[in-house]
């Protein structure tokens, strides 16, 4: 056996253990706390963060696609379910719902997702250990993506989810931006724990304010907002988090009202399902994805005076009913009464944030116990694409 362990590593391990033991019994009034998450999730968080310390930031400027009409700083992606016309190679692409085209340009999406994963893990490790090395590396990623002029992403998604022969970009492309939500939350955590300078945080917030302006005024943003399925909910989640970060109370209030008057009435069925998602070729995965986004909307926007977790329409529809619908099928997937997903059926379920945060909101230990029993995250690229919240410790006080 190798006993050659540095004193520094021994001290870090000792301090982390001491921190977790001292706080393991500290509970909030709902029987749930970030300290319990730290205790449960610390090994995964710190192991990942230590690996990410070895990786340099990778901006979108490292990759280009000759099909993009944008500049090197413009995010570019292509529609997932669009394929070449088998009868005419020169014709516009045709749609095959649920079937992802593996030949599409994915480099910018992957770079954004990797940044999101790494910034979130590094910030989570910093919150647990208070070791500044994690914060410094997270900030390095954030500045690469949102501050440095030669590598930053332009604050728009004009060229997201393009379709060959049809459009250079479109409103539904904004859904690619869901992987910016956790980095936005990380900025606040870094601020709260003195892990980022005021200058750096203000520059990053400036980028998000500009992006928020684009999301809420550009025709693509408006188009995405008005989508009736999960796309419209993802718009609200993004706007809610970016508005919170940039102290835009007007947009925060707008999102609260939109959840109450547009999302719930038009999306949630009487039984708590999402009927539009059940009609898709991947109804299980989309139902899980959509309830997770609902949960994040409630988590971001709820206040002591306006708790969206408790909000219900006059007929009783609310997120509580949505969680109650999907919970049995997370607990026992074999009971799912609808068609199986055409792809990636085996990727789900995982530690869905809706389970964890609903467990907190409704003081339901069964939800939290089930969350703990599941694998941390999906493994396939498409699964990761629809799983933007990976570090719940960033979302609790």
Regions found by a protein language model. Name each.
Residues 207-249:
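Loop-centered beta-sheet repeat module
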Residues 237, 241-337:
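Long, repeat-rich segments with strong aromatic
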Residues 25-224, 257-260, 300-305, 312-397:
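Extracellular glycan-targeting catalytic surfaces
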Residues 13-23:
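Bacterial N-terminal signal peptides
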Residues 2-12:
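Bacterial N-terminal signal peptides that target proteins for export
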Residues 105, 198, 216-227, 246, ...:
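Active-site-adjacent structural elements in folded domains
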Residues 176, 232-233, 287:
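An alpha-helical repeat/solenoid feature that recognizes helix-turn-helix modules
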